[in-house]
């Protein structure tokens, strides 16, 4: 039974990554935002698979290499787009991922049914707000907002 469960998770993961790839290739959003919007789209279109991948009990599991690579890619995109160092880019990603995961989870559980335009605006607002904590208007770290 465990082997079947792992196979289903593997196939669900393939479908998730295909959804992310389609979102990125569509070029409707900057690359980093496209990843978050793809995550939310997957939650809306594949509710049960989203729950299986991202809302199951993982207390006995190790992180996969794919998850680690996803974080590295996200951090690199943030560093490239903002000029932030690795630690700040990592924190920005974690904080925004929590926001995006919250929206995706509420959509996957039918708590919310928001249009993609509203979600896009909210993701942009959260990104800009979190980024502002790390960068002041002149591009230097602002120690007063930490």
Locate each region found by the language model.
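An amphipathic alpha-helix adjacent to DNA-recognition modules
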Residues: 1-21, 37
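Amphipathic alpha-helical packing segments from all-alpha helical-bundle domains
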Residues: 14, 18, 60-86, 90-94, ...
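Amphipathic alpha-helical segments that line or abut small-molecule/effector binding pockets
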Residues: 29-44, 48, 90, 94, ...
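Short secondary-structure transition hinges
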Residues: 41-77, 105, 109-112, 117
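C-terminal regulatory/oligomerization modules of transcriptional regulators
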Residues: 107, 138-146
